Design a protein with these regions (language model features):
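ASCE RecA-like P-loop NTPase motor cores
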Residues: 1-140
Length: 140
């Protein structure tokens, strides 16, 4: 689990383990390269929007609003989309890799911007149910 040891040590243990689960935050979305069957499942709990109280994000949003721009559409959404693509990219590193990406955030299905975010992801096969996911993981 992230925080129990330095990142490089956690990554080494994960790579060397026969079967392992690595729990990490967005800090593991960049610089992680685990190709092959060692990484077969990535779970993303929520869309990676910047916190609205982040001082840099707030300053940029305010500056955009003053100039008539829409901060959510032109700043928050593109940033979250790029971050999600980076997170999803941890799963498939080579042409022969396969795995399951689970995004738990309902906003992908309930908000108008959800389709835009999904269309920016690599062309994964989309599954809608737990049963479909189990079937996918059972495939050779």
């Amino acid at each position: 689990m992230q925080g129990e040891a330095p990142r490089h040590e956690l990554m080494t243990r994960f790579r060397e383990a026969e079967a392992a689960v690595l729990v990490g935050s967005a800090g593991f979305w960049e610089g992680v390269d685990i190709a092959g069957d060692k990484l077969s499942l990535v779970i993303i709990d929520k869309l990676p929007f910047a916190p609205p109280d982040d001082p840099i994000f707030r300053a940029r949003s305010q500056a955009m609003a003053r100039s008539g721009q829409h901060a959510f559409r032109e700043l928050a959404l593109p940033q979250a989309t790029l971050a999600l693509k980076q997170g999803a990219g941890r799963l498939i590193r080579t042409e022969t890799d396969r795995g399951l990406l689970v995004i738990c955030d309902e906003r992908l299905r309930t908000r108008s911007y959800g389709a835009r975010i999904l269309s920016s992801l690599p062309p994964f096969r989309r599954l809608e149910s737990f049963e479909e996911a189990l079937d996918f993981l059972a495939e050779d």
